[in-house]
Amino acid sequence: MSLNLILTHPGGSHKDELLACSLLAAVHRVPIVRREPTPEDLADPTIAVVDVGGEHAPERNNFDHHQFPADHPPVCALSLVLQHLGVYEDARQFCDWLEPAEWFDTRGPNVTAKWLGVDRNTMTKLNSPIDVTVLRRFAKAKHLEPGEPLWEILNYIGADLLEYLRELRTRLDSIAQQAQIWTVDDHEILFLPRTDPLPDEPSAGIDRYLATIGKATSVAALIYPDRRGSGYGLSRHNDNPLYDFTRIDKQPDVHFAHARGFVAKTSAAEIGRVKELLGLARV
């Protein structure tokens, strides 16, 4: 259902409703108003009521969490909007900042700091003036229309987040179809063959893919297409010390090996030769 308006509470602003409004703005491109909702607003499915109203009713586009019991799992307005858009599970998996944001909004800074295993002052040191300014300006606004600078910033934030989630999901599905896992002695190697066309960043998403299949620690090295050449890139995974690619820097078909040994590029396209180079780089 199309929206005509996004409504959230007035006063101080937090990341959860700002991001929730940003997502809805990116999808529906409608004004954002900051005021208390009326019963008519809550009953109107063309008005999204975010982080206020005491009701979670996605069928009417009402996304509040404050009525949930104190022992409810940490869920904020952003969580509810992500669920509504069908991307919550991917967001929890791919956005490392989301779960802390849910905790911060529902449990407060002290409990969140304890949950993260840091002190409150450490969290304060991570504050950014970008966050402060955008939240402050959003809190001062009463009505934002498409085309206005702050509305467009929110739209960019929401659009970029949705694009990131959808493109990463597509990329991971592609890697899952193409990747091979080789077993070498007591560890594994991920090999990603060349395709036509190549993705813009052939190595993008590999770390996330390995985490999703439970091989983040067992894979020691990666082999993937070199987007600047006809061969492959070879790199350590998680800086695993089993491989030092400076050991192959004198090979005639290796045109780059980083001085720190964590990555190399070869023009070799034949898999047997790539495996040979990998063996030569073994410490």
Q: What annotation goes with each model-predicted range?
A:
Residues 1-62, 69-70:
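Short, surface-exposed loop/strand segments
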Residues 3-4, 11, 15-22, 43-46, ...:
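C-terminal accessory domains and tails appended to enzymatic cores
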Residues 25-29, 34, 59, 72-73, ...:
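Generic marker of "main functional regions" within proteins
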Residues 32-41, 91-104, 116-118, 152, ...:
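Short alpha-helical "patches" and their helix-cap loops
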Residues 36, 40, 55, 89, ...:
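Glutamate identity and glutamate-enriched acidic tracts
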Residues 47-133:
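A basic- and aromatic-enriched beta-loop-alpha substructure that forms the phosphate/nucleotide-
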